[in-house]
Design a protein with these regions (language model features):
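Solvent-exposed, charged interface segments at domain starts and junctions
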Residues: 1-14, 78-90, 137-142
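Charge-rich, low-complexity N-terminal segments
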Residues: 1-37
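Cysteine/selenocysteine-centered motifs that mediate thiol-based redox chemistry or coordinate metal-sulfur cofactors
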Residues: 15, 23, 109-154
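Intrinsically disordered, low-complexity boundary segments flanking structured domains
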Residues: 30-32, 41, 132-133
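Structured beta-strand/loop patches that form or line metal/cofactor-binding pockets in enzymes
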Residues: 36-81, 87-89
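Short capping/connector residues at structural and topological boundaries
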Residues: 71-73, 95, 149-151
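A hydrophobic, small-residue-rich beta->alpha segment in the mid-to-C-terminal subdomain
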Residues: 82-122
Length: 154
């Protein structure tokens, strides 16, 4: 399989979405889901390595950017024996998490993408959405409704 032809068929936004999902996924959950998928052979293009990145922020989300602080990340890249290439960047020092994320990224560019999506990405997306809704429900429960009463004084 020609990796160049395969890579051109993939929508960039879709790939960014699944790579973000894999990076945010809890490592134990991703490892558990990976057990249901046949692990393909691969060679390392870049073994997992730990480094730091500067995290930038903006005041109010729209202001001038500023350096918020540094964060540890692990990155890697690999090529499946069938030619597909996968990349991963994950927060923290978990090399196994980065490897699993890169494997899924590579498999999503190959012929088994629909099976990998059903076995790995869909459960991760469902769990992430459920956690988001639970967090929103907890926040909603603490919401205070303020109101103004008209006083009889002139």
């Amino acid at each position: 399989m020609n990796a160049t032809k395969t890579a051109t068929k993939i929508d960039t936004a879709e790939r960014q979405a699944w790579m973000g999902l894999l990076a945010r996924a809890p490592a134990p959950r991703l490892a558990g889901l990976m057990r249901a998928v046949a692990r393909p052979g691969f060679t390392w293009l870049r073994r997992p390595e730990v480094g730091g990145v500067m995290v930038r922020g903006r005041t109010g989300g729209t202001g001038a950017p500023f350096n918020l602080g540094e964060m540890t990340v692990t990155r890697c890249a690999l090529r499946l024996d069938t030619g597909e290439v996968g990349h991963a960047h994950v927060q923290g020092r978990d090399k196994a998490h980065a490897e699993a994320a890169a494997l899924v990224d590579a498999m999503m560019t190959g012929p088994d993408a629909s099976a990998v999506r059903a076995a790995v990405l869909d459960p991760l997306a469902g769990a992430e959405q459920a956690a988001r809704l639970a967090r929103a429900a907890r926040a909603e429960a603490t919401k205070v409704a303020f109101f103004t009463m008209v006083r009889g004084e002139d």
